[in-house]
């Protein structure tokens, strides 16, 4: 899951859940500018695209995430996960010695929700490259599926599983995650978001405003989605490198 999540393969197909909607709305006082529109993605694709700091291209303009629609349900579902960036795992427990998952760093995670987009600029002819923010996504299997089949390919035992429950967690901008800066700057009360590329003074002002308005400190939160997917599971893979080779094959 982690390998496929990092490479952006997860998943576009065989997903049973609905999607996430990003809405761009023209302000009440504005008579010009981009028209109102919605972008929809499956939740696992949205986990990579609809995140603070990423740039979205649509309707001849560029847009960024400004606010998530965090209702009472989403706020109540904030929970602490434990992640180990070096070993590339995420768990709900402090550690699982059976699978070598110990020494994880705690981080609060909120379910990815529908969101509002803000207009940044118009797309110009000078833009030959489009920006896509690199993110760190970890995945884990949940204890539910709809059964399947087991077979062997060469030396590898493989299971074809239908409706396997998975959870994917976006820890933030990839380079900052490597430096130990986990999570996205989010207000857990109103859902306002700040890009990880903001300078410290901007982050400080953002935190101050939402502390005064919302009555709660702004923190770094991971974004999480759960889904059911059809999958091939290769057993007894010796290393991550071998897993990457098999996945790309």
Locations of regions flagged by a protein language model:
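Extended Lys/Arg-rich polyanion-binding regions
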Residues: 1-249
């Amino acid at each position: 899951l982690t390998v496929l999540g990092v490479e952006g393969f997860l998943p576009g197909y065989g997903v049973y859940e609905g999607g996430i909607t990003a809405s761009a709305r023209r302000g009440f006082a504005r008579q010009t500018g981009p028209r109102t529109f919605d972008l929809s993605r499956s939740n696992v694709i949205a986990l990579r695209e609809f995140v603070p700091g990423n740039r979205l291209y649509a309707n001849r303009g560029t847009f960024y995430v400004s606010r998530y629609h965090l209702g009472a349900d989403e706020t109540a579902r904030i929970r602490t996960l434990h992640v180990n960036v070096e070993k590339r795992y995420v768990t709900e427990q402090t550690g699982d010695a059976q699978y070598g998952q110990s020494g994880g760093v705690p981080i609060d995670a909120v379910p990815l929700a529908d969101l509002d987009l803000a207009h940044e600029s118009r797309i110009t002819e000078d833009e030959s490259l489009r920006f896509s923010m690199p993110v760190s996504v970890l995945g884990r299997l949940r204890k539910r599926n709809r059964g399947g089949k087991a077979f062997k390919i060469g030396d590898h035992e493989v299971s074809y599983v239908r409706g396997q429950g998975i959870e994917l967690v976006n820890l933030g901008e990839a380079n900052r995650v490597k430096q130990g800066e986990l999570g996205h700057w989010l207000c857990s009360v109103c859902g306002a978001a700040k890009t990880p590329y903001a300078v410290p003074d901007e982050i400080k002002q953002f935190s101050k405003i939402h502390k005064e308005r919302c009555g709660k400190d702004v923190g770094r939160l991971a974004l999480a989605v759960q889904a059911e997917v059809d999958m091939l599971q290769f057993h007894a893979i010796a290393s991550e490198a071998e897993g990457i080779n098999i996945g790309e094959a």
